[in-house]
């Protein structure tokens, strides 16, 4: 499987065209090609399921789980991907199917326009599957999502599906993404309570410790339960920071807060942490020798040679005993390179918190105290051009409120921008998965202000895209009617000229330019 590859699903695609001999993410030609083989087998399963009735959910659950393994920065273990391919083939045999998997190569579609439409749909679908997989871990699922996943994969598998049909499915993918995010929000809040506003400290303690990175809250819950009386502290890294805002997690005194920065700073953060690291979703970078002997993966994450915590059995927890035993033997964390931050950034501005005072916020808008809301959300990455998001936030006038979700927050979440009539100018909504809260807040603000359409709200969007969850969020926003969204630091490599024409003409999608120019344009509603 070694040799050539083609992958352009993330923002780090080489030359903004595509990676052909390994990716900066750590993907090799072997794992890239295996992931494409897996998707081809999943298409065959979807083609088999399409039109059938009375089929159990187990096949849809498998598709969602397997698609989640193909997100950027998730699974670089060939053995694990081979196992998923074999599982797909077993599903076909169970279904008594003679459907053959289509050509797995992205480049097998020679027409670049058609290829772009197909891959745009697949990448949005990956984001939907990731949201759904997180909800499924908590026992929540929705047939509307499963039915769409099967329909969309089937359409992408058929060589005669016209790009007009694919375009309609891309739009529908945005609608389903909203449903998937709403489902995940319901799962999280039903299980752990609604996030509450709080400061989250970034400060190293004196006990041996475990650092959990990723976005799967169920894993953190089970780890906290298993370490409750172990005199081991637990910290969060990257997007897992949001867990500190849920009431169910805050009852654990050994959950100490955040450590380090965004997912991509993990090489330095994991090295200085000293303790054990567990990565549970799409945020793993190439593992460095400084911490190779004390990192574990779980969920759909995989790195060859790194120990893996296997799936939980029904009615049981995952077994973190090996992680805990190793943590006992290791020294406490040292301060991260960024140093301690106490009391830490304010987080927990979920829709339940913000919407409870939405009428008051609307009055501040009507009085001119708040002139505009700027949503700076999405994922972070290594690209130096992402410093734009820091400078943009600094350039925004003092009568603006910044809403953020996802790793993009780490570009500015420790800045002190003050408050407007008691409202913090930076409102951290949560993970990229929690972008649903931004949608809910916007809809409630629309109601409170009596504005007919969402695109007329005093709200501007600047998305920091990196991977497929942000693609799904982007599609959800477009489907709901938001316009003039800025997307950076670059446009996706899979945006063909035809796709770009539609996005700019019909939705007003824009590239980022300079922080000062974009800040001024957004204040004018552009």
Give a label for each model feature:
Residues 2-207, 211, 231, 238-241, ...:
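Long, compositionally biased, glycine/small-hydrophobic-enriched stretches that function as flexible linkers
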């Amino acid at each position: 499987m070694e040799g050539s590859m083609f992958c352009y699903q993330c923002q780090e695609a080489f030359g903004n065209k595509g990676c052909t001999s390994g990716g900066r993410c750590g993907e090799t030609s072997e794992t890239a090609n295996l992931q494409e083989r897996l998707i081809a087998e999943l298409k065959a399963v979807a083609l088999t399921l399409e039109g059938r009735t009375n089929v159990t959910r187990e096949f849809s659950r498998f598709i969602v789980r397997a698609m989640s393994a193909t997100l950027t920065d998730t699974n670089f273990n060939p053995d694990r991907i081979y196992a998923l391919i074999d599982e797909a083939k077993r599903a076909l045999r169970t279904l008594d199917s003679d459907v053959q998997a289509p050509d797995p190569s992205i480049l097998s579609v020679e027409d670049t326009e058609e290829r772009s439409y197909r891959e745009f749909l697949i990448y949005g679908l990956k984001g939907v599957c990731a949201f759904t997989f997180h909800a499924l871990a908590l026992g929540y699922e929705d047939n509307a999502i499963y039915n769409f996943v099967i329909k969309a994969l089937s359409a992408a598998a058929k060589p005669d599906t016209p790009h007009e049909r694919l375009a309609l499915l891309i739009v529908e993918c945005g609608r389903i993404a909203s449903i998937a995010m709403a489902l995940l929000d319901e799962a999280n809040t039903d299980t752990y309570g609604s996030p509450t506003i709080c400061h989250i400290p970034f400060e190293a303690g004196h006990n041996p410790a475990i650092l959990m990175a990723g976005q799967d809250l169920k894993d953190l819950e089970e780890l906290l339960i298993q370490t409750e009386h172990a005199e081991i502290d637990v910290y969060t890294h990257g997007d897992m920071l949001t867990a500190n805002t849920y009431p169910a997690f805050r009852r654990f005194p050994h959950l100490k807060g955040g450590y380090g920065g965004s997912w991509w700073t993990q090489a330095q953060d994991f090295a200085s942490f000293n303790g054990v690291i567990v990565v549970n979703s799409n945020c793993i970078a190439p593992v460095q020798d400084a911490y190779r002997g004390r990192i574990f993966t779980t969920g759909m994450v995989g790195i060859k040679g790194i120990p893996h915590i296997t799936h939980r059995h029904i009615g049981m927890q995952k077994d973190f005993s090996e992680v805990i035993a190793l943590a006992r033997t290791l020294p406490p964390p040292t301060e991260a390179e960024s140093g301690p931050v106490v009391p830490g950034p304010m987080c927990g501005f979920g829709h339940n918190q913000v919407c409870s005072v939405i009428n008051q916020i609307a009055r501040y808008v009507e009085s001119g105290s708040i002139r505009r809301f700027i949503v700076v959300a999405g994922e972070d990455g290594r690209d130096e051009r992402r410093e734009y998001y820091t400078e943009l936030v600094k350039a925004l006038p003092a009568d603006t409120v910044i809403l953020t979700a996802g790793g993009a927050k780490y570009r500015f979440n420790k800045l002190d921008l003050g408050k407007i009539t008691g409202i913090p100018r930076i409102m951290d909504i949560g993970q990229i998965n929690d972008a649903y809260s931004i949608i809910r807040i916007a809809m409630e603000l629309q109601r409170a202000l009596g504005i007919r359409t969402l695109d007329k709200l005093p709200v501007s969007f600047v998305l920091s895209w990196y991977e497929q969850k942000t693609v799904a969020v982007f599609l959800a926003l477009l489907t709901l009617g938001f316009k003039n969204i800025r997307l950076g630091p670059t446009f996706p490599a899979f945006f063909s000229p035809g796709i770009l024409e539609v996005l700019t003409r019909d939705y007003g999608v824009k590239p980022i330019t300079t922080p000062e120019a974009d800040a001024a344009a957004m204040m004018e509603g552009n």
